Amino acid sequence: MWRLRAVLGAAAICAIAMPLACVAAPPPPALPAETPAEFHPLETGFDYSERHVDIPMRDGVKLHAIIMIPQGAAHAPILLTRTPYNAEDLSAHRHSSHMVAMLDGYDNASDIESEDGYIRVIEDVRGKYGSQGAYIMNRPWKGPLNPTEIDHATDTYDTIDWLVHHLPQSNGRVGLLGISYDGFTTLMGLINPHPALRAAVPMNPMVDGWMGDDWFHRGAFRQINLSYIYEQEATRTNDAKWWETHYDDYDMYLAVGSAGALARSHGMEQLGFYQKLVAHPAYDSFWQDQAVDRKLAAEPLRVPTLLVHSLWDQEDIYGDIAVYKAIKPKDTDNSRVFLAMGPWHHGGEIRDGSALGQVRWGSDTALWFRQHVLRPFLDHFLKDDAPPLGLAPVTAFETGTNEWRRLPA
């Protein structure tokens, strides 16, 4: 009996003590986070300010853009690039308090853009990186290949409309420029353009993907582009990376046997654009109906345009010359369509243009182009009270003599 009482007493004590212990037990110690809930970087001494915005389109989709505004800007023109290559990256090639360093890289004539006081805007196209919506490779304009009411022309229009109404530092004039795919989006902005679009500089643009730009070169499929298509279409942010089986691509092509086999080994049947390439190996209506030069030939000439051609462009050797032939006849007084041709590879006009491989030109041809062709073109059409334009219809670098020539249309 005594033992029973002892057990019952101990149980009662435990029953009372355990809840008290649970309530009274202090929480384990924790170190406070050193990362603030929201960090506000200081930009003291920066020669620009930066905004990250999401611009609404007419269908409700929002497109992500980076806006860089020089300190003290007033009545400044806007230079816009629309890209599938990540606006965040193209606006931050380096991390710096100086705008010229931030923009020093692909798609940016950083010396002209920063020295001349332009507001720089870089926007992710629909469906890529920070932008909402569906991505379509070289999205066609509204028509047989695009039954929707949305294309690059409408997105460009809506973007420009938002910019001129939300950037009080601007003079309301916008220029489009871009290289390669971004040259393609620049040309698309010429279709039913916004009234504030006053100049366009398509550099090495994709124009006809079968005739001579990117995918086919007059019917010869460029299997080297499979890796580009894979990374561009597999994910919104290019997270899926093309993997190699050989150190040398040539050995890989020999080993795999065909472009189709190489694509299948990487699962590319899942990608919409690859399916279109397989379905349209010939120059059928699929390619003809999205050839940008054909479209622009049927459009009124509304926007002054400077086409930039690289004489040794390994990717888009066809497009800018084709567009020049299509729209130049409309420029009867030689005041709105210009062509510059330099001794560069694809995109070489924004880099050091002193040489091509081992061939040296005796000067930085790209710098000369930017200072003597690009700058006066942009100044004339975008700046307030700009000086008269003295450009020849064609400005071309002549190899051998290594001199720039001013040529008639």
Region locations from a protein language model:
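Alpha/beta-hydrolase-fold serine-hydrolase catalytic core, especially in secreted/extracellular enzymes
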Residues: 26-52, 56-61, 195, 276, ...
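Glycine-rich nucleophile elbow surrounding the catalytic serine of serine-hydrolase chemistry
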Residues: 178-188
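Accessory cap/linker subdomain of secreted extracellular hydrolases
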Residues: 88, 95-99, 103-109, 115, ...
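N-terminal cap/lid subdomain of alpha/beta-hydrolase-fold enzymes
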Residues: 66-126, 133-140, 322-329
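Bacterial N-terminal signal peptides
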Residues: 7-21
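Gly/Ser-rich "nucleophile elbow"/oxyanion-hole loop immediately N-terminal to the catalytic nucleophile
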Residues: 72-73, 134-151, 158-175, 180
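Short beta-strand immediately N-terminal to the catalytic nucleophile in serine-hydrolase-like folds
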Residues: 176-178, 203, 308
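Loop/turn elements at helix/coil->beta-strand transitions in domains of secreted/extracellular proteins
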Residues: 62-63, 75-78, 116-120, 170-174, ...
